Amino acid sequence: MPTPSMEDYIEKIYSLIETKGYARVSDIADELFVHPSSVTKMVQKLDKDEYLIYEKYRGLILTPKGTQMGKRLLERHALLESFLSIIGVDPSHIYHDVEGIEHHLSWNSIDRIGDVVQFFENHPDALKTLKEMDPTKPDTKE
């Protein structure tokens, strides 16, 4: 299993390839706010663990294993963003909160959160009831 740091790199590489068609060491460094030398070290480790194929000065490509993991990690991130949005977390906190929790949840927990998100997507009345429970709204009952 990849470490949380490895997951961050795989997710970012997958995302870059999906949006730009490629991922360069400099792009990854810019996106993750790290030095290119740190990216090179991690890319070499990911190559050794068969998540990608890296050739110095030529770039990198994800292996099927890396592509599958990258897709799953990106979906996990989006799912957690949806969940936090549904439960009323302030949008300005969502990205940071997801970054803080995504590596600490089991895949079983992620699947259950997916069930909750799907439930609220399929039951707008239940979502409306949940939104009405928002503690930040002033109590209008007297």
Swiss-Prot record:
GO CC entries: cytoplasm
Name of the protein in question: HTH-type transcriptional regulator MntR
Annotated organism of origin: Listeria innocua serovar 6a (strain ATCC BAA-680 / CLIP 11262)
The keyword Transmembrane helix belongs to this UniProt entry's keyword annotation: no
Database matches in SUPFAM superfamilies: Iron-dependent repressor protein, dimerization domain, Winged helix' DNA-binding domain
Entry-linked PANTHER family: IRON (METAL) DEPENDENT REPRESSOR, DTXR FAMILY (PTHR33238), TRANSCRIPTIONAL REGULATOR MNTR (PTHR33238:SF11)
InterPro entries linked to this entry: DtxR_MntR_Metal-Reg, Fe_dep_repressor, Fe_dep_repressor_sf, HTH_DTXR, HTH_tscrpt_reg_MntR, Iron_dep_repressor, WH-like_DNA-bd_sf, WH_DNA-bd_sf
Top-rank taxon, per record: Bacteria
Function: Central regulator of manganese homeostasis.
